[in-house]
Amino acid sequence: MFVKICGITNEDDALLSVAMGADAVGFVFAPSTRQVAPQKVYDITRRLPPEILTVGVFRNEHPSRVIEIAHKAGIKAIQLHGRETPDQTKEIAGHFRWVIKAFASDDENLPNADRYGTDMLLLDAPSPGSGKLFDWSIAGDAPDSMKLILAGGLTPENVGNAVEEVRPWGVDVASGVKKEPGRKDPMKVKRFIENAKAHAIEQYRGDDNIPYDWDFE
């Protein structure tokens, strides 16, 4: 079970998430209350263990800007959370071996997500970042060929049920482990990760289990 803590805005929360067992941390570069500057993210990512996957979240950004910001920030993976086309997504994937394409649960393109040329699919609520749940059975519409990351309204209390019902490859949380704006709650982070992994059939095994070439240029 791959667990990503998203919406990281400071070094303390990044280190906390790693210490609690997170496999990845996400930084939002799209306009948002959780938006962070590339230089600040770089200062954080260089303090993290190399096995931790650092993910930059973008929305409707031109591919050249995504690539530029990602390199400045020192992140290893890209998450596209907007209306990016298959061609745009593939262009970005030409520079980053691990690109996650996010889809809202009501997106009519979900059954054809494999056209975007990524290995990873993140399934979110219709209003990303709202903290609201959606009908998990919709996950059945996602292509079987893709690794599914479930997001949207997950909390320490419901993530176990979500993992048992959907059997995703991974889970993603932001507001569900929030203490206050811009800060994570240590106990919520700990319980979320523990509950997600406790209900998983398979445990995530680090970079041996992800399609990422760390020397890829």
Predicted features, each with a name:
Residues 1-217:
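Conserved N-terminal beta1-alpha1 strand-loop-helix module at the mouth
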